[in-house]
Amino acid sequence: MKNCRYILFVAIFVVAIIAQAQVPYTVIANVGEDASTTIRLNWHTDEGSGESVCRYTLADDVNWEYVKEAKARQELCTIFDSIYSKTPDGKDFYEDARFIRNTLEISSLTPGTQYKYYIDGDNTVRYFKTAPTNNNWTATVISDFHAYTPIASRTSAAMNMLSTLEQQRGEFDMVLHVGDIIAWGGSYSFWKSLYENSPFKKYVWAGVNGNHDNMSRGYALQTNQFFANTNNNPLNGYDGEMGVCYHFTYGNTLFIMLNNESMASASGLNKAQKWVREVIANNPARFIVVMEHYQWFYGESGKSSQYDRWKTLFDECGVDLAIAANNHIYARTNALYDGVETDGARGTVYVQTPSSDNERGQALKEWTDNKSLIKSRWSEGGKTVGALMLNATNENLTITLHDRNGNVIDTAVVKCKR
């Protein structure tokens, strides 16, 4: 009897140790290519912790009676290991980051439906929502909060911005980010800390790789793999950009997500633009939205930036809305076609988000360029916090800029052209 009790005790102890080791971290829900029926999850577990399982069901399944489970695909990730970084108290250190990357695509889901899930032995319940089949949905659009554990207030400012919009407008269907959500993308501890915030546990996220997300401290290493390994985006990009550049359909809207860091050269730009043309040709949609990190215009003066590189393609392909960031100043046009403003029946609305970290904003300066194109500029100076709401119907997309208190600063409507 004593031997049986001892064996039972050891078995329970071993199970407890395994369960503890399998608690996931850096968990995020990303969109699937068809966001109405597919979700893609990404999380990390410790080396040697064994297989990892996600259990999910409808959000209103109170007792988890109809739970389903799926095992993750696993691979060792070492891209962040030994990278020079900083601790939350500002001390220099090298990241100790070797872990198992777990990825999972869940398909055959019900459109427009809220689900809940948990992973392994973790008692944290997280949520995601599939896109509707019609075009009635809402998203918040945010960028440039440069999460940096020694200055936690940056992340707090951005998360509070999301909370303010949530309180005023109700829960959104997804969060779109336009890059630079991390100060140094190579600092794994920054990603891990950021993903512990509530919006990462209750929303689906879709974003683009920013220059800060792409770099380690001091630009010692620059790679899109920091972004790729902390997300599980659709693998429908082009060579070298799988899981970084991608596209997805949300309702009746086609989103195309770009990586500026691969488009510095003429050949890199041509490669990206060839892919964009193919995606648009093969994925007919009511609205077409393109997102990249670098700004269309320099908001402080109005001078052209990426607008000059993309306007011809957008005109030819019928892009409805172009969203960018990076400049930390909000700027917005009405619909533009062939370099002039239209009545909205054709052309692209260009918009770029302000920063949201209350620390790294830019002040407006004399408006010297593109006064006939840019309709609105906004900044609070160095301490700027703002974000957009994007509301969709079958007839239009409505973009609204909000300040940190939720006040509406600017609004634009993108008309349906198809």
PLM feature spans:
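Bacterial N-terminal signal peptides
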Residues: 8-16
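Acidic, histidine-bearing metal-coordination/catalytic regions of metal-dependent phosphoesterases
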Residues: 19-147, 392-418
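Extended active-site neighborhood of metal-dependent phosphoesterases/phosphodiesterases
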Residues: 96-105, 113-127, 131, 189-277, ...
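An acidic-aromatic substrate-binding cleft motif
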Residues: 99, 123-178, 183-184
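Active-site neighborhood of phospho(di)ester-bond hydrolases with catalytic His/Asp-centered motifs
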Residues: 140-143, 174-180, 184, 205-211, ...
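Acidic/histidine-rich helix-loop elements
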Residues: 60-98, 139-159, 229-237, 264-268, ...
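Core catalytic region of metal-dependent phosphoesterases/phosphodiesterases
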Residues: 155-216, 316
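Active-site-proximal segments of metal-dependent phosphoesterases and phosphodiesterases across multiple
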Residues: 262, 268, 283-324, 342, ...
